[in-house]
Amino acid sequence: ISIFLGEQLEDVVAQLVETGKADNLKEGGVLRTGVSTLPDFVKDATDRNRTSPFAFTGNKFEFRMVGSEDSIGSPNTTLNAIVAEAFCEAADRLEGAEDFDMAVHDLIKEYASKHQRIVFNGNGYSDEWVEEAERRGLPNIKSMVDAIPALNTEKAVALFEKFGVFTKAELDSRVEIEYETYAKEINIEAKA
């Protein structure tokens, strides 16, 4: 999975990683209509990348991975657990910091540097991204059924148990349910 930040936010992150601070804000520019009777418009610096599974669109992130017939509940539960872990880790470090502002600065720079490999503002459907993701060491899970085993890995179990979301037995059950649902849907489609 990659994340789309847009030119403006990507530039801020790049400044943080390279210099440790972000002093300049990239402007969106002007969208010229080419028609003398119409005004030119300010171009949004965040753009709209519709091929990204997780995109920043001005003032929010959009999560676009869930299929149209699927519930957002399970992915949201997972995202919330991941965010809770990140907040917990950040809070532990910041609460013990002697210089809070410097600790925030260092934490942002560290996170931006550590996770820079998931930022991709190009076409997420292209062969270029598949090659780039491989070069960056990112997994390329091509189907939902291939993603199911990630639900009950040691890392996933530890995350969900840490926050009291799911036990290992509950995650094992969810894996079984996902496989069963997939098999039923494939059988129905095969008979149609």
For each predicted feature, which ranges?
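Acidic, glycine-enriched catalytic cores built around paired aspartates
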Residues: 1-192
